[in-house]
A protein has these predicted regions:
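Active-site entrance/lid segments in N-terminal catalytic domains of soluble metabolic enzymes
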Residues: 1-130, 134
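Glycine-rich phosphate-binding active-site loops on the catalytic face of alpha/beta enzymes
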Residues: 76-78, 137-146, 198-199, 205-232
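Catalytic cores of alpha/beta
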Residues: 55, 119-133, 183-186, 199-216
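Glycine/Thr-rich beta-alpha phosphate-binding loop at enzyme active sites
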Residues: 79-90, 127-189, 231
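Electropositive phosphate-/nucleotide-binding environments in soluble metabolic enzymes
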Residues: 13-17, 51-54, 170-174, 202, ...
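His-Asp phosphorelay/catalytic-motif detector in bacterial-type signaling
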Residues: 107-108, 189-191
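Short catalytic-loop micro-motif centered on adjacent basic/acidic residues
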Residues: 111-114, 194-195, 217-218
Length: 237
């Protein structure tokens, strides 16, 4: 489908000191009033317990805050990896434990969690109830994981699942946003939503905000058009 991507680069990272310096440099160059959100994720080692994974998340969040982040976005999903950090949002108990540790690490900073696609509304609700006491916002949807075939029907990427982004997932994103907006409304929760995934034009921004989103992020759309956000802000929606 035109305008859609099969994303396969995982979550590579430089050593912590490198990105800590980068965050500090970025913060020093931002104009007053700009909000710097830094995305962090754990790096699980083979055999790590969920408590050890939570400690790594918390450590990275504290590093980000100490380096100048105004808020921290913890990545609980990556559709291109099979490790626990990439699927954390699908395990409500583990997600709640990690969210609690993150909140302890950065008690005075906004905490956002980025999640992937839920296929089951009850699983989504269990996740929401587990993390809602600890977070300020949820960011969704971080791609849809599926196998990809070429024009001849042959599996690509050695049959491994990849994250699909772009136009192909837009309807799924709005459906999931509607679920979570309902959870928030029914429980009078203060958790806010940030829309991402499949959004690439002014009309998408308007629809996401109309469904209760506090803000909208661009991912693959901004790779194709780095000036997209500025253009929408300038021209309105």
């Amino acid at each position: 489908m035109e305008g859609s991507w099969a994303i396969s680069f995982g979550m590579p990272s430089k050593p912590p000191r490198f990105w800590q310096d980068d965050v500090a440099a970025t913060r020093s160059r931002l104009a007053k009033g700009k909000f710097l959100s830094v995305s962090v994720v754990a790096t699980p080692e083979p055999g790590d317990t969920i408590d050890e994974v939570a400690s790594d998340y918390a450590r990275c969040a504290r590093w980000a805050a100490d380096s100048g982040a105004d808020g921290v976005e913890a990545n609980f999903s990556c559709p291109n990896v099979s490790s626990v950090d990439g699927q954390l949002y699908l395990n409500a108990a583990d997600a709640g434990l990690v969210a609690a540790r993150l909140r302890e690490a950065i008690p005075d900073k906004p905490l956002l969690l980025k999640v992937g696609h839920f296929t089951d509304r009850e699983v989504a609700l269990a996740f929401f109830e587990a993390v809602a006491p600890y977070v300020d916002a949820l960011v969704m949807v971080n791609g849809v994981s599926t196998c990809v075939r070429d024009e001849q029907g042959e599996l690509m990427f050695e049959g491994r699942c990849r994250g699909i982004g772009g136009v192909a997932i837009r309807d799924l994103v709005f459906e999931q946003l509607a679920w979570f907006a309902g959870f928030i409304r029914e429980r009078a929760s203060s958790v806010r939503l940030v829309g991402v995934g499949g959004l690439g034009q002014a009309a998408d921004v308007a629809q996401a905000l109309g469904q209760g989103c506090e803000a909208v992020q661009f991912a693959t759309a901004a790779m194709l058009n780095p000036g997209l956000g500025l253009a929408i802000r300038r021209e309105g929606f």
